[in-house]
Regions:
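Conserved acetyl-CoA-binding loop of GNAT-fold acetyltransferases
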Residues: 27
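Conserved acidic residues
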Residues: 85
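Gly/Ala-rich phosphate-binding loop of Rossmann-like dinucleotide-binding domains
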Residues: 23-24
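Class I (Rossmann-like) S-adenosyl-L-methionine-dependent methyltransferase catalytic domain
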Residues: 1-6, 15-19, 31-66, 70-80, ...
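A conserved beta-strand element that flanks and buttresses the S-adenosyl-L-methionine
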Residues: 88
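Class I SAM-dependent methyltransferase "Motif I" SAM/SAH-binding loop
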Residues: 9-14, 92
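A short, conserved alpha-helix within the catalytic core of class I
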Residues: 95-107
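Short beta->alpha connector loops
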Residues: 13-15, 98-99
């Protein structure tokens, strides 16, 4: 997705272990998260002492190779975030209810100038369980991103241990490559 030295943005990142994995491969990580406690735990687990500064209405936790913005992701601006080479959406789109997803997809485009994305979604019978994570069908991924990105499904697999007590859950991994011109 992005090589060493690339800056990867993880929206609604929480304290995912993927951050340490990316940093271990030389990526610079930027993230956004609503839960301050999760970010404090993340930095403790990474054994990093962040510098905490204001970024508009957000707090910015920074250390070598990592910047995490705490607060409402919709308050994050391109000026706060800075340049991004790629987006890794592991659990953000599926965390949002349907009425917010279109706004979110547009916000990511405006934040990053349409950086390429790796997106992970789940599909299941939404009537059987409330989200989050919410079920996001393949046609919705195409509707949200197809006008601005070439949408390619890389892999589809059943979630082995299910999700939310459901046994029939499918995980889809998508690559979104910006359409240029």
């Amino acid at each position: 997705m992005a090589g060493a030295g690339s800056r990867v943005f993880l929206p609604l990142c929480g304290k995912t272990r993927d951050i340490a994995w990316l940093m271990g491969r030389g990526a610079r990580v930027a993230g956004a998260e609503l839960n301050r406690g999760a970010i404090e735990q993340l930095f403790a687990e990474l054994e990093l002492a962040p510098e905490v500064t204001a970024a508009g209405s957000l707090e910015r936790f920074s250390a070598a190779g990592i910047d995490i913005f705490v607060g409402d992701v919709f308050a994050l601006t391109p000026a706060h975030l800075g340049p991004v080479d790629a987006i890794y959406d592991r659990a953000a789109l599926v965390a949002l209810p349907g009425d917010v997803r279109r706004r979110y997809a547009g916000h990511l485009r405006s934040l990053t100038g349409g950086a390429r994305q790796l997106l992970i979604s789940y599909e299941y019978d939404q009537s059987l369980a409330k989200g989050p994570p919410f079920s996001v069908q393949a046609d919705e991924v195409h509707a949200l991103y197809g006008a601005d990105y070439h949408v390619q499904e890389l892999e589809t697999a059943p979630v082995e241990r299910g999700l939310k007590g459901l046994s029939e859950v499918v995980e889809r991994i998508w690559q979104l490559v910006p359409r240029r011109g």
